[in-house]
Amino acid sequence: MRIAIGADHGGFELKNKIFDYLSKLEDIEVSDFGTYSTDAVDYPDIAFMVSIEVAKGNYDYGILIDGIGIGSAMAAGKVKGILPATCNNVTTSKAAREHDNANVLVMGSGIVGLLLAKEIVNNFIRTPFGGGRHERRINKILKFEDANNKVEIEKFSEKPKKILTKDDVLYAIRNGGGVVYIDKNAIITPLAKEFADEKKVRIIKR
């Protein structure tokens, strides 16, 4: 099972702990889409990155964490094919999968603690879709989505911002480069900036 996880600055710490938890499960492959510090970022950028990867079929599920769990769900729901669910208890996490076939779980770090978050995540990813009458209802949602021209992946006009991390700088050094080229709208984490300055690596936006 492949899972994409991401958070804004409000969900950064809980996201890291959930990432570590999932990384230790043998049947799970998890990828971290940022953010990588507590510096303020815009939750739609992270939500779009994770949701697009899930919609493309590159990941089975997405997990998004912000302060309350509402904004990221709103953003994720704008990506065609994404059925996000804000779940701040175990009951809703089970129902989101069994009844609604949700493929992106959203949580609020200001609402749930680590132990509850682990339970929510585990129930979400382990609960199969019930199908039957539930499938009929979900199909109505998807049909309405198609008819009303929601944002499609291939037509996504604003590319999500790249987040430059220390690992990106290290990769450049290992490949003999003293320069890292990034998009003009990219986010540079403080650790990446400090590391680049220390190693005399230039970061050029273009």
Across the structure, where does each feature detected by a protein language model lie?
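A short beta-strand-loop structural module common to alpha/beta enzyme folds
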Residues: 29-40
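Short, high-confidence coil segments that cap the C-terminus of an alpha-helix
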Residues: 59-60, 101, 177
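Short hydrophobic/aromatic-enriched beta-strand-loop microsegments
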Residues: 82-89, 200-206
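Structural motif
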Residues: 39-48
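Intrinsic disorder
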Residues: 118-119, 143-206
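C-terminal binding/interaction regions
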Residues: 2-14, 91-153
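Helix-adjacent hinge/juxtasegments
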Residues: 50-86
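Short, solvent-exposed amphipathic alpha-helices that sit
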Residues: 13-24
